[in-house]
Regions:
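Structural/interface elements that position substrates and couple domains in central-metabolism enzymes
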Residues: 2-376
Length: 376
């Protein structure tokens, strides 16, 4: 394919390795960073941090360094924006968690995008601008789109990389997540990435992509807490943790798979809820540092309460009676032990004083209604 003119507004620990990778694939890469120190280091081929493979590419790169954003905009068809969205040091995981919470700081990102918008106003074309930075869902719509020219071609394309292996992760991703409403922009970026790898290209809305990025990161955190819970149980009960995790890792059908990743009711049946409660008892017996299993059951109850409230408020707003479908703990069975549907029915009984009917041809003879209802 014809080499593309690609720019990077930000040449830090994320932007520079990715820029070097595209340069190495033969694209014409332009880079600009507001830090004079960063620009000087790159010009002198100095990488002040360890990033596997990047120094070798920096030594032989043919990237053009732009000394203002106007020069960057004038030369590029695609501009990546890997500008940091920092957090207060209190929220970076090196100190104890407090009651306070905070969103990321978007000031640097907003300033960079606003600058690009200003520079583009003098052009007769609008390059595709691709934000890479991590943001929370709704941020781009709320914080950025309102200040931009309507012709501004904005996309969101966060990377799933880890510092230290940025170059390798960029070249060998699991997938490319791309949020945009611009069909042409998506096709151009898909063509660009095809010169680097053959990873699947997942296109969605910007807001969806914003959540997917942080959902991915926090899912990893959840796995680590679970694994460390197993480690602590094993340490305190004389069990081999490697044997436990090695066996669980073989469960590629239900555990290490997309199964159970769709939203819906909580888990049920004769094993899951009772096992969590039994393991919570064991956590207390062993004096675990954290009762992961109690958290699971509390989450199950809170989410069931939320679903019950959603059903009842929808019922009240529509002036239609609520009606539940499915009493068993899962489809195609008549077993009701541990059923989250029964838990929800009981919560509605407690909270609203309503004995809500449930139709399930496998468990009862409650007929399917003929009149309009709010079904759940």
């Amino acid at each position: 394919m014809t080499p593309m003119n690609v720019g990077f507004l930000g040449l830090g620990k994320l932007g520079l390795p990715c820029a070097l990778a595209l340069d190495d694939e033969g694209h014409q890469v332009f880079g600009y960073d507001i830090s004079e120190v960063t620009m000087k280091n790159i010009a002198n081929k100095v990488l002040p941090y360890r990033e596997e493979g990047s120094q070798e590419l920096l030594d032989k790169n043919s990237m053009f360094l732009c000394y203002d954003s106007q020069d960057l905009v004038a030369n590029c068809d695609i501009i990546f924006v890997p500008i940091q969205t920092p957090h207060d040091p209190r929220f970076e995981g090196t100190t104890r968690l407090t009651e306070e919470r905070a969103d990321f700081d978007y000031d640097w990102l907003k300033a960079g995008i606003t600058d690009l918008n200003t520079q583009m106003e003098s052009l007769d074309r609008f390059p595709i601008v691709v934000i890479i930075s991590t943001v929370l869902p709704g941020t781009i719509e709320k914080e950025i789109l309102g200040v931009l020219n309507p012709k501004f071609r904005l996309c969101y394309n966060p990377y799933f990389i880890a510092m230290g292996t940025t170059l390798a992760d960029f070249r060998n991703p699991e997938m490319i997540l791309f949020g945009t409403e611009d069909e042409d922009a998506a096709e151009v970026l898909q063509e660009l990435y095809s010169t680097v790898h053959n990873a699947p290209f997942f296109r969605t809305t910007i807001k969806n992509a914003e959540l997917i990025k942080v959902a991915y990161n926090t899912y990893i955190g959840m796995k680590i807490v679970y694994a460390n819970t197993m480690m602590e149980i094993c340490e305190k009960s004389g069990v081999d943790v490697d044997s436990v995790i090695d066996c669980l890792s073989m469960a590629s059908d239900r555990l290490i798979s997309p199964k159970y990743l769709r939203g819906g009711m909580g888990d049920g049946g004769g094993c899951h809820p009772r096992d969590n409660i039994a393991m919570s008892w064991l956590a207390r017996e062993l004096d675990l540092s954290f009762d992961f299993f109690e958290t699971l059951m509390v989450g199950r109850e809170y989410q069931t309460e939320w679903l019950a409230e959603l059903l009842m408020t929808t019922s009240e707003a529509s002036d239609r009676d609520p009606f539940m479908l499915g009493e068993a703990f899962k489809e195609q069975t008549n077993l009701t032990v541990g059923s989250p549907a029964i838990l929800m029915k009981n919560m509605i009984q407690e909270g609203w004083g309503l004995d809500i009917p449930i139709h399930d041809p496998h468990t009862n003879d409650v007929p399917f209604p003929t009149e309009a209802k709010v079904f759940f």
